[in-house]
Swiss-Prot record:
The keyword Transit peptide applies. Mitochondrial GTPase involved in assembly of the large ribosomal subunit. Plays a role in expression of the mitochondrial translational machinery. Pfam families: MMR_HSR1. GO terms for cellular component: mitochondrial inner membrane; mitochondrion. Coiled coil: none annotated. Gene3D superfamilies: 1.10.1580.10, P-loop containing nucleotide triphosphate hydrolases. It is found in: Mitochondrion inner membrane. It comes from Schizosaccharomyces japonicus (strain yFS275 / FY16936) (Fission yeast). One of its GO terms (biological process) is mitochondrial translation. It is a peripheral membrane protein. Disulfide bonds: none annotated. This is Mitochondrial GTPase 1. GTP binds at residues 57-60, 143-148, 195.
Length: 328
């Protein structure tokens, strides 16, 4: 199955395993549009029995009422999200005790303030007891908004300018970043990290979702294939979501042709270039042009299926580690 796990991701995982200590806090940023598939089993072992906050970022692209970024409506949406999905999540999580869930839109200060308060609670207790340094590691898949969340936290806490580089394509942060102070007068620091993709894709549909939300670099899958999947999902929701581009259709070629003609995004000589227009449609999706919706099915059955796959993967990895040790 298609995945994207370049060397720097493997190195990051190893460096994190070596550097995260018992007192540190893990902030795992996931994409609210794929709350289930952006779980990364590779991070489960890293965060096991440590204080962890799971942040569902980009709620504005997942929940309709957060779309206009109006403060109260965005917050209500986050609350609704927690009440419905997070309950389901908590029921199925394997290590429940140490983690909390927060939904965010990285440029809505109220969402960030809630996260900041939670981090204050989690880090101050250790800091007060010993005055030792506490690190907050911001981890997650590529392009989920780790750097944006970090910048927003630092701005809300210290009114400081941006420290982490933000980019619209995945793989912008390539190294475990320098530590930056989070709270005035406290030895509490944040660490930005490169996005880590799942070493193994659990379900074929996940790869298409990662490409769609841009967690995976464009070009790993054909853009037209990804748009075909988007079209399928839009048709399930309501074909009126794309009337500005095309009349209702199940056929991706017709859709792309109509979209190219409607938008004037044509290739050389005024012909339709499927890849060009598909790439444009993907950009539109990523800005919320088709509305806000969650791509993962949150049915209990899906959760069970997913957890079974994750458990199998963990067992397979354990067996591999055992046999390597025996050989050595
Ligand atoms: N709509 C929306 N976009 C966001 C949000 N947070 C971040 N973004 C955008 O998502 C893109 C990626 O943000 P980054 O903060 O660079 O993501 P990252 O996880 O640090 O990325 P890598 O370094 O590639 O792993 C940027 O274009 C941001 O502007 C959000 O809450 N909503």
């Amino acid at each position: 199955m298609t995945t994207w796990f370049p060397g720097h991701m493997k190195t990051t995982l190893k460096r994190l395993r070596d550097s995260v200590s018992k007192n540190d806090v893990i902030v795992e940023v996931r994409d609210a549009r794929i709350p289930l598939s952006s779980r990364n089993p590779a991070l489960e072992t890293l965060a096991a029995n440590r204080k962890r906050v799971v942040v569902y970022n980009k709620c504005d692209l997942a929940f309709p009422s957060a779309g206009d970024l109006c403060k109260t409506r965005a917050l209500n949406s986050v609350r609704a999200f927690e009440e419905t999905y997070v309950e389901t999540l908590a029921r199925w999580e394997t290590i429940q005790t140490l983690r909390r869930y927060v939904g965010t839109v990285s440029n809505v200060p109220e969402c960030i303030k809630r996260l900041l308060q939670l981090l204050q609670k989690l880090t101050y207790s250790d800091h007060a007891a010993s005055n030792r340094t506490v690190k907050v590691f911001v981890v997650g898949m590529p392009n989920v908004g780790k750097s944006s969340v970090m910048n927003a936290l630092r701005h809300a806490s210290l009114h400081r300018r941006k420290v982490a580089v933000v980019g619209s394509h995945p793989g912008v942060t390539r190294n475990v970043g320098e530590v930056v102070r989070l709270f005035e007068g406290k030895n509490v620091y944040m660490v930005d990290t490169p996005g880590i993709m799942l070493p193994t894709i659990l379900q074929p549909e996940d790869a298409i979702k990662f490409a769609l939300v841009h967690a995976m670099k464009d070009g790993r899958l054909h853009n037209a294939v990804v748009v075909d999947y988007l079209l399928y999902r839009l048709n399930l929701i309501d074909p009126n979501t794309y009337t500005r581009l095309s009349s209702p259709t199940n056929d991706v070629s017709t859709f792309l042709h109509n979209a190219a003609v409607h938008t004037g995004k044509l290739g050389k000589g005024g012909t339709v270039n499927d890849d060009l227009i598909a790439s444009y449609v993907l950009q539109l999706y990523r800005t919320g042009f088709f509305g806000a919706f969650v791509l993962d099915s949150m049915e209990e059955e899906q959760w069970q299926q997913r957890l079974a796959l994750e458990k199998n993967l963990v067992r397979r990895n354990q067996r591999r580690v055992c046999s390597t040790r025996k050989k050595a």
